[in-house]
Amino acid sequence: MINATAKANEDWKDMLKEYNIDETLLNKNLNSAEFKNKAGNVKDDGNKCYTLKNSDIHGKGLFINREVQKNEVIGYALSNNERTYLGRYTNHSPEYNAKFLAIKNSSDMITVAYKKIKIGEEILVNYRNHTFKKEYYNKNLI
């Protein structure tokens, strides 16, 4: 039986193939000084509902400090065109427990629990539902 971490990593690679995104090029872009400069300027929204920790899925992740109910707003992923910790450190999984929702007539985006999230669980979204638009990524990679 495949564990959740391996399943999330396998699904990530499958998704890159589906969207025709070159993983080497993507990693080069993500590791560039320009990206790290931008990524380093992440707005801490002061939300005490989660903690930033090392993730078995990828790098850093956000872990719940208190039980979160289905459809509860966890916080902003994007606020005034600035990414927050939720926008930067929420990892991908096909077995997701949260969603990003755009706020109508705004550039803001919130993170909402898709199902009940227990203390200690990592906040996960399915990137297929949100961020990957192959036209954008294929033309904007270094």
Provide a role label for each language-model segment.
Residues 1-142:
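Conserved catalytic SET/PR domain of SAM-dependent protein methyltransferases, capturing the structural core
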